[in-house]
């Protein structure tokens, strides 16, 4: 049987033949470092490939401060132009396969991280950590190891939570929830729903992301993916059934959320209903702290509060899915590995305070201080209820973010196909779970070494 590594290599080579060199798909962004030449004999320039806008994401500030602290190293910021982070990684894969210089690379999820480990793209970091004399578990809240090897340092670490329109809450005399279940979330959504037709205001909005189809599953402390660590199916988990019941209750029964069919047909931006007052609540990631104060696409017109991710049962602990993290790695083919490691260590520790946009996985961050810092940099801090965000962060426990097999995207795609049939009324929950379970088992079997 063909191994996973062989299949990945063949796929990458095939893409290169069809697409050609991907260098034209990347853009060197103007930063103080990128415009500098190597004036000193021992000066090193490392290339940092990512998908973010350097100025908007304040990466330029992080890079400038790093270079000030490390005068012998320059960082060239290279943005991979694409519609989203996942698409940008396809361009990264092309660059790697064509022999382009890669030093530091960024990945947006545990799935994309695991895939690149499987490709052999990433350098083990254990020797660098040992040389520095640090223990990973003492430094970071998120474990990135695969079979005991660390191939990345974690960046952002933000939980999923509920955004609430304070105007709508006050109108309905509803308090900001500080601890609640999904049943209570449903009740809020029913109360906040008003009107009919084009004037209807929904109590909540659930975007058609793959992650929305596994809300309750992803909030479990462990075994929170569609496949278990031993590569057996997890499709029959009660938490996956609850995930489907969440969609059923809001979209099909109470109609307190826009239907899947309407979302798809209107091609809505994920934030449009909430920012335009067409939905009173939305489960989103903590990264929205930087946006609810308004940004170029959606100016703020009301105050947003935050509530914890709902629990399945009242007695459950306050676990929440990890909504936003980054994996920062040194490329295995890099000739500047030591410099690359220094950069990702700085970025994933002190760099977050310089960036002022996200909470990081570094254990030594002063969380409340960082929240205040982030809010102060938003367009309209007065529209952000910082105290409710702090309350969420003070009690949240992060669900374990496991490292899935490299073929996990196949499983997610198969499940989403079944969820679509369910949301369009073509099959019930039992059938959806049964067919998903069969597909997960089949995909796992086909991908066995």
Describe each model-derived feature in a short phrase.
Residues 68, 74-76, 172, 252-255, ...:
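Extracytoplasmic/periplasmic substrate-recognition and gating elements
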Residues 358-416, 421, 447:
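Long, aromatic- and glycine/proline-rich binding clefts that accommodate carbohydrate-like moieties
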Residues 7-15, 21-114, 119, 134, ...:
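Conserved N-terminal structural module of periplasmic/extracytoplasmic solute-binding proteins
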Residues 124-136, 178, 196, 202-204, ...:
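Short, solvent-exposed loop/beta-turn-alpha elements that line the ligand-binding surface or hinge
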Residues 94, 102-103, 132-168, 200-206, ...:
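A structural signal for short loop-to-beta-strand junctions that line the ligand-binding cleft
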């Amino acid at each position: 049987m063909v191994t996973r590594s062989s299949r990945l290599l063949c796929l990458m080579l095939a893409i290169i033949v069809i697409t050609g060199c991907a260098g034209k798909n990347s853009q060197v962004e103007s930063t103080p470092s990128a415009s500098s030449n190597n004036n000193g004999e021992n000066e090193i320039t490392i290339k940092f490939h990512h998908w973010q806008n350097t100025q908007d994401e304040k990466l330029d500030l992080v890079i400038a401060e790093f270079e000030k602290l490390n005068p012998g190293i320059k960082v060239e910021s290279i943005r991979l132009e694409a519609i989203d982070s996942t698409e940008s990684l396809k361009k990264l894969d092309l660059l790697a396969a064509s022999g382009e210089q890669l030093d530091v690379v960024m990945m947006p999820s545990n799935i994309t991280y695991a895939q690149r480990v499987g490709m052999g793209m990433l350098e083990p970091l254990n020797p660098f950590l040992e040389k520095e004399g640090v223990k990973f578990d003492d430094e970071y809240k998120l474990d990135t190891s695969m079979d005991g090897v660390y191939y990345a340092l974690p960046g952002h670490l933000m939980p999923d939570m509920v955004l609430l329109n304070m105007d709508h809450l006050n109108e309905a005399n509803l308090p900001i929830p500080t601890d609640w279940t999904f049943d209570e979330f449903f009740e809020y959504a029913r109360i906040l729903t008003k009107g009919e037709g084009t004037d209807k205001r929904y109590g909540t909005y659930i975007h058609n992301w793959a992650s929305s189809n596994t809300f309750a599953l992803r909030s479990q402390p462990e075994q929170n993916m569609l496949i278990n660590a031993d590569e057996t199916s997890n499709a029959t988990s009660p938490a996956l059934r609850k995930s489907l019941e969440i969609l059923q209750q809001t979209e099909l029964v109470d109609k307190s959320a826009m239907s899947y069919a309407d979302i798809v047909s209107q091609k809505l931006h994920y934030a449009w209903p909430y920012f335009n007052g067409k939905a009173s609540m939305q489960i989103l990631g903590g990264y929205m702290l930087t946006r609810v104060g308004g940004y170029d696409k959606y100016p703020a017109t009301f105050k947003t509060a935050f509530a914890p991710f709902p629990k399945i049962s009242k007695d459950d602990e306050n676990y929440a899915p990890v909504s936003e993290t980054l994996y920062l790695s040194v490329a295995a083919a890099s000739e500047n590995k030591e410099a690359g490691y220094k950069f990702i260590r700085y970025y994933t520790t002190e760099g977050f305070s310089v960036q002022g946009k996200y909470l990081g996985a570094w254990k030594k961050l002063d969380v409340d201080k960082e929240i205040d810092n982030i809010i102060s940099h938003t367009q309209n801090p007065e529209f952000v209820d910082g105290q409710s965000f702090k309350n969420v962060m003070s009690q949240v426990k992060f669900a374990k973010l496991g490292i899935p097999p490299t073929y996990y995207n196949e499983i997610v795609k198969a499940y989403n196909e079944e969820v679509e049939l369910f949301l369009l009324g073509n099959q019930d929950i039992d059938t959806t779970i049964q067919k998903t379970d069969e597909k997960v088992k089949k995909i796992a079997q086909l991908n066995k070494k």
